Curated annotation (Swiss-Prot):
Its main location: cytoplasm. It comes from Haemophilus influenzae (strain ATCC 51907 / DSM 11121 / KW20 / Rd). It catalyses: acetate + ATP = acetyl phosphate + ADP. The active site is at D147 (proton donor/acceptor). This is Acetate kinase.
């Protein structure tokens, strides 16, 4: 068996894992351990096409999950084929512009960036430390891949806020973006699709899932993206508000008497599609009931969502200027599967000569890729499934094999 990479994506109460062959992209194992610290802590997986699940025990967390993977799921052949471990890291700050092997200095850098990703980075560090324990022979073969790295090519005019400059110089307050691993992968897929070298492609990439972001790529490099200091800025998302007037925070605090913790929970966990529908963060609910007059919240939510998305796409078309836009790409759970969202957003962009092909759009869902615009459309719109795990596996292999 060829050299394989174990990929870990640690959250505060869950752990996603996979084993990939970086040379072929073949997935040997995928799974999710969840409900950490609760009585119902559990794990489920798919190994060579066969599904399995198990209880981890009341209160189990990252340690128990990784030990279960190593001891109960992996057979000796697969375990011996794991040559390195790749970790997804949400925030690397300004320091990290590419993937690196884990060292004490790198761990310190992830800790320093945790102030901008307080829910994610501490959990990633737990994953790294537990991986050291579960796979001690691979301690010097752990690699971290940063979601912020691809966006580090943004120019100053794109990443700076119009705040006192000292906040940036002394405290790192600037725009960092997120979903960079996905944006990087899809930008390379766009290049293949249009027959151009990766370092010559110009694209607008819409990564739409429960979280969502748009990036604009010129000559293969990101020059702007919708998320900011944190993943709260930008698009309407499942539970996140995206762009708002910052003074709303003052109003909620001073006039409505909400605490800062309550405000944070409102903006991060109670807004977006959930806030607009007052029912659910699931985009499919709004889609399925869009024409139901008894549920006006669904039309309201989807219209706001797609309007905000169209504004970002249009703005980024302007940012490209004289550079020819090769394609607008849709990816992520919503981007790949919601023909309705794509249609609503692109219909706002008729001024640019974009023409959506309804038949192609409806046919391009559920893992299918393809062009969804007409042959005479001024610009192509393409649906391209993302593969962040493959990027992590390949980056890890480059550094370790």
């Amino acid at each position: 068996m060829s050299k394989l990479v174990l990929i870990l994506n640690c959250g505060s109460s869950s752990l996603k894992f996979a084993i990939l062959d970086p040379a072929t992209g073949e997935e040997k194992l995928s799974g999710l351990a969840e409900a950490f610290f609760l009585p119902e802590a559990r794990i489920k997986w798919k190994l060579n096409g066969e599904k399995g699940n198990a209880d981890l025990g009341a209160g189990a967390a990252h340690t128990e999950a990784l030990n279960f993977i190593a001891s109960n799921i992996l057979n000796d052949e697969l375990k011996n084929s794991i040559a390195a471990i790749g970790h997804r890291i949400v925030h690397g700050g300004e320091k990290y512009t590419q993937s690196v092997i884990v060292t004490d200095e790198v761990v310190k850098g992830i800790e320093d960036a945790a102030q901008f990703a307080p829910l994610h980075n501490p959990a990633h560090l737990i994953g790294i430390r537990e991986a050291f324990k579960a796979f001690p022979h691979l301690k010097d073969k752990n690699v971290v891949v940063f979601d912020t790295a691809f966006h580090q090519t943004m120019p100053e005019e794109a990443f700076l806020y119009a705040l006192p400059y000292s906040l940036y110089k002394e405290h790192g307050v600037r725009r960092y973006g997120a979903h960079g691993t996905s944006h990087y992968f899809v930008s390379r897929e766009v290049a293949k699709y249009v027959g151009k070298p990766a370092d010559q492609v110009n694209a607008i990439i819409c990564h739409l899932g429960n979280g969502g972001s748009v990036s604009v790529v010129r000559n293969g490099q990101c020059i702007d993206t919708s998320m900011g200091l944190t993943p709260l800025e930008g698009l309407v998302m499942g539970t996140r508000c995206g762009d708002i007037d910052p003074a709303i925070v003052f109003y909620l605090y001073k006039t409505l008497g909400m605490s800062m913790d309550q405000i944070e929970e409102t903006l991060v966990k109670k807004s977006g599609l959930l806030g607009l529908t007052e029912v659910t963060s699931d985009c499919r609910y709004a889609e399925d009931n869009y024409d139901d007059e008894s549920k006006p919240e669904t039309r309201r939510a989807l219209n706001v969502y797609s309007y905000r998305l169209a504004k970002y796409i249009g703005a980024y078309m302007a940012v490209l200027g004289d550079d020819h836009l090769d394609a607008i790409a849709f990816t992520g759970g919503i981007g790949e599967n919601s023909a309705h969202v794509r249609e609503l957003a692109l219909n706002h962009l008729k001024l640019f000569g974009i023409k959506i092909d309804n038949e192609r759009n409806l046919a391009t869902r559920f893992g299918k890729d393809g062009v969804i615009t007409t042959d005479d459309s001024a610009f192509k719109a393409i649906v391209l499934p993302t593969n962040e795990e493959l990027v992590i596996a390949q980056d890890t292999a480059k550094l370790c094999f």
